[in-house]
């Protein structure tokens, strides 16, 4: 059923010029597609360029998912979400951002990255988060 729905979504995406990104969630939030590797299997079975994979650093860390799964996703990877420990903004925790950036480079990913976190005080936290991302990103 998941693959059938993804094919339907892919067809709809093709008609509208939209990419469908499968975002795996951690097992506290979902019981289906809980890793980038699983999402890649579904995307491969659907085999449509409109059906891709999203890597969310928070969910990957929650599941202790190896960052090599990002490298393995390669060209199927279409978007990335970042946060830090406790789902707070990047730069406040212990996530291994150098290894994450290296995995993205290994996948050939060079597109946008979204910060998806729990902001406690957006006006004061956004500048340090952006500074951290700019300073830690090797590109």
Residue ranges and their predicted role:
Residues 28-46, 61-74, 91-94, 124-131:
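Distinct, well-ordered alpha-helical segments
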Residues 20-22, 51-55, 78-82, 111-115:
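Hydrophobic faces of well-ordered beta-strands that scaffold small-molecule active sites
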Residues 7-15, 44-47, 68-77, 98-109:
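Acidic (Asp/Glu)-rich catalytic clusters
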Residues 135-139:
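Generic C-terminal helix-cap and adjacent flexible tail
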Residues 1-52, 62:
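Active-site acidic/histidine proton-transfer and metal-coordination neighborhood
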Residues 76-89, 106:
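A short, conserved beta-to-alpha structural element at the edge of catalytic cores
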Residues 24-28, 57-59, 84-86, 119-121:
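Active-site-proximal loop/turn and secondary-structure-junction residues that shape catalytic pockets
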Residues 114-125:
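A short, acidic, flexible beta-alpha connecting loop/helix-capping segment that sits on the rim
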